[in-house]
Design a protein with these regions (language model features):
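Glycine-rich, aromatic-flanked loop segments that form ligand/cofactor-binding clefts
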Residues: 1, 16-51, 164-166, 234-256
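Single conserved hydrophobic/aromatic residue that forms the stacking wall/gate
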Residues: 2-8, 13, 553-556
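Alpha-helix-loop-beta-strand connector modules within alpha/beta enzyme cores
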Residues: 10, 14-31, 92-108, 157-169, ...
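Active-site beta-loop-alpha junctions enriched in small/polar residues
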Residues: 42-46, 85-87, 109-115, 142-146, ...
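Active-site mouth loops of central-metabolism enzymes
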Residues: 48-64, 111-122, 176-189, 254-281, ...
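Alpha/beta enzyme core
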Residues: 55-79, 86-106, 117-163, 188-200, ...
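Domain-level signature for proteins that mediate thiol-based redox and metal-cofactor handling
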Residues: 115-120, 125-132, 138, 148-247
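ATP-dependent carboxylate/acyl-activation modules
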Residues: 218-219, 223-301, 306-309, 313-321, ...
Length: 556
């Protein structure tokens, strides 16, 4: 529909792409001098923002791009170059449309501002993480600024990217004179900076707005003999949302556990009643209390989990910019969520069972993600650290067959209840150490499992949490609304010099009394109308408004 409206008619789209590619191929053959010159189908944005920031559905955008991609391949394009994208969600729709409907290599470039942000908020690591997860062939930056202004962004891209990098600047920043836009970087100046771009590691270079044949010719002249740097594989374990990236492996991160019906009567009721505002408030409370990632589990008997999981993920991403952990054993629900997720999600989980790996790894390969590997297999949970480490190695080896790297695997060392397994904590801590030191993989635990069946569980949980962090826990699945757990987290990072000058600890506790209550959930705190509107909580905003109007009426 959008393609038809933008170009004029279905026939016009088909003919425009066919004729454009034919003319480019004719020109390339004429100028080739016997060299092989490739023709790229260049695909830009739709001009619309996707929901929730705009009114365009993800799948509608996908279908629009799909039509163009298919026509491009049929017309003879050698590759697809998606460019000038300012929204990771639209970018994902375009990449999936290209990969699912053609066999062509896919390049993608985005338009960053001087802060290193896309229009919709994504930073450089977020964009790189998502695109690499989608198996892009090359990525980079185009438009928006001149070559000199692009250098700081390029340095960030080179730091995180493990695939070839593309740079296509404007001929400087756009300027106005007598009502006309012009660019003031000369071909010589442009080419001089592009030499530095190649020195930094860019593999594909070109020009965007304001560049002329003279700019490109001078760039080729100055850069053609510069050796191309080899591509360096990076080992960052990173998850992302549309607005931020979270790196695992430095300090210990927090996955908020509250969006999960297990043991939560009120949450189960909310799922059955389709009370999404309750779920969203759980997410917001955890973000406010320090979570870095939010677990999302909506599995209940007699609930359409695939549909509800997709809906909850979309709604959560409209009110929080934290990365999400897709927590389900239903692979249909998992794929639904991964497909519409805006970023690179965490996925909970796969196990060492062959059936599990056969089902989950293809989804991770297709959509990207950091997947949690449970240290159990067909024989159950090993009683020893050695057994769990061997299963971890098995998971990593099997993932490699799908092209999934170790950096995109986090192993759950499994916290066992000490009331029934007295040696459970010791085995788990040893497993954490060995996974860190011998296997070199990030780790995760559902920390509160350790205390099940015991009185005063917060005491056991917080002490064990500290011990786990000391033994290599990369990320803990905890309740961030619990003061005991958060005190343990802040204190540990201050004591281990993972909190520069104890800044986070001081900011958190300098104005607080020495003791504070433990909260099982943060949902009960009173939210203001302003906060409800800013968070996108429609039902909460309506409720607060009604209460305010009623109170005002009574006072009158």
């Amino acid at each position: 529909e959008i393609g038809v409206r933008l170009v004029g008619s279905e026939m016009c789209i088909r003919d425009s792409i066919r004729l454009a590619i034919r003319h480019v191929k004719d020109a390339a053959e004429e100028a080739s001098g016997g060299r092989r010159i490739y023709t790229a189908l260049d695909v830009g944005p739709t001009g619309k923002l996707l929901k929730p920031m705009g009114d365009l559905d993800f799948e509608t955008a996908y279908e629009t791009f799909k039509e163009v991609m298919i026509l491009g391949e049929k017309a003879g394009a050698d590759l697809i170059h998606i460019e000038t994208m300012s929204d990771t969600y639209e970018l994902k729709a375009a990449v999936l449309a290209a990969k699912e409907n053609t066999s062509l290599p896919v390049f993608a470039t985005t338009i960053f501002d001087e802060r290193g942000k896309l229009l919709t908020g994504a930073d450089v690591p977020s964009v790189v993480a998502m695109l690499e997860g989608l198996r892009i062939d090359a990525l980079g930056i185009n438009c928006g600024m001149g070559p000199e202004q692009m250098l700081p962004i390029l340095e960030q891209i080179m730091k995180y990217s493990s695939v070839p990098v593309i740079v296509k600047p404007n001929a400087g920043l756009p300027k106005q004179k007598d009502g006309e836009t012009y660019y003031d970087v000369s071909p010589e100046e442009f080419a001089s900076v592009m030499r530095h771009v190649v020195d930094l590691g860019a593999v594909v270079i070109g020009g965007c707005c304001g560049t002329t044949p003279a700019h490109i010719a001078e760039m080729v002249k100055q850069c053609k003999d510069i050796p191309v740097k080899p591509i360096e594989k990076k080992s960052y374990t990173v998850v992302s949302s549309y607005g931020q990236s979270v790196f695992l492996g430095t300090g210990s991160k927090i996955i908020g556990e509250r969006i999960n019906p297990t043991g939560k009567k009120r949450f189960k009721q909310a799922l059955k009643e389709h009370d999404l505002d309750y779920i969203l408030k759980e997410g917001i409370a955890q973000q406010d209390n320090g979570a870095h990632i939010l677990d999302v589990n909506v599995g209940l008997p007699d609930i359409d989990e695939p549909t509800l999981m997709k809906e909850v993920v979309q709604e959560l991403q409209s009110v929080t910019n934290l990365p999400l952990q897709i927590d389900t054993v239903d692979t249909v629900a998992m794929e639904n969520a991964l497909r519409i997720y805006n970023g690179k999600a965490m996925v909970n989980s796969v196990s060492g069972k062959q059936e599990s790996m056969d089902a989950v790894f293809p989804l991770i390969r297709k959509y990207g993600g950091v997947v949690i590997g449970l240290a159990l297999d067909e024989d159950g949970i090993p009683a020893t650290a050695e057994g769990r480490v061997q299963i971890a190695k098995k998971i990593i080896a099997e993932a490699a067959k799908y092209g999934i790297e170790k950096k995109d695997i986090v192993i759950d060392a499994l916290a066992m209840t000490i009331s029934s397994e007295p040696e459970g904590a010791k085995v788990t801590l040893e497993t954490l150490r060995r996974l860190r030191d011998e296997v070199g993989v990030c780790t995760v635990l559902g920390v509160s499992n350790i205390s099940f069946g015991l009185p005063s569980r917060p005491i056991v949980n917080s002490i064990f949490y500290t011990m786990a962090m000391q033994n290599g826990l990369s990320v803990g699945i905890i309740n961030p609304n619990s003061e005991d757990m958060m005190k343990a987290w802040y204190a540990y990072h201050a004591l281990m010099n993972l909190d520069s000058n104890c800044e986070n600890y001081i900011n958190k506790y300098a104005q607080q009394p020495g003791t504070a209550p433990v909260s099982a959930t943060g949902s009960a705190h009173k939210m203001t109308l302003k906060s409800a509107i800013e968070r996108g909580l429609r039902e909460e905003a309506n409720s607060i408004t009604s209460e305010t109007v009623s109170y005002t009426h009574l006072r009158a």
